[in-house]
Amino acid sequence: MRTPGSMKGLEELGRVRLSKNFFFRDFLFSEIANFYAIPNIPEDPDLAIEAGRRLCEELLEPLQATFGRLHLRSGYRCAKVNEFGNKNNLNCSSNANTAADHIWDRRDAKGFTGATACVVFPWLVDNYNDDGDWQKMAWWIHDHLPYASIMVFPKLWAMNIQWHEKPARRIRSFAEPRGVLTKIGMPNNEGDHSEHYVGFPALKR
């Protein structure tokens, strides 16, 4: 697919189905792009679609099937939008660090593909409200799904959930308790963690 050069072309990209319940258009909205009038359009739509499909099929679909509707806070971010956000302190890391992350259509420095979406789980915030309860969902995902990395934020316990060809299996948080919950090499990265999410539903697909 060519890079969209018109509204009609962008419509066609938006109609691309990434999985059973998700289309590319679901991931195109960006507050930065919207407010500052920067088109959020991929330079390499085919690569963005490929990575987005893996994200949706392997992570978002089973999460939605298990926990109900997901609220998508953000998804795809083109390099131009991300660079603007980085230079203007709008909570965007550098393009190099965001490739194969929110920038779905750029490979990372090692040539791997990846894609990230920021997700809120209404089921989680409706059922849990104690400090640190986000860890229940994080451990459930860790035990059940092939995620690459998770970053947790304080507001609504929104989570950046990444699919990547070379998963780091790392969970970090800006919500309390802050820091690294697990990563490859830590003793808690392996094994079963079901004691942390007692009462959670079984995985559905």
List PLM regions with ranges.
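A general marker of short, structured functional hotspots
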Residues: 23, 32, 72, 193-196
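Cell-envelope/glycan interface and biosynthesis
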Residues: 29-142
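Alpha-helical protein-protein interaction elements
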Residues: 15-21, 27-28, 59, 68, ...
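Catalytic cores and adjacent binding grooves of peptidoglycan-active enzymes
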Residues: 103-205
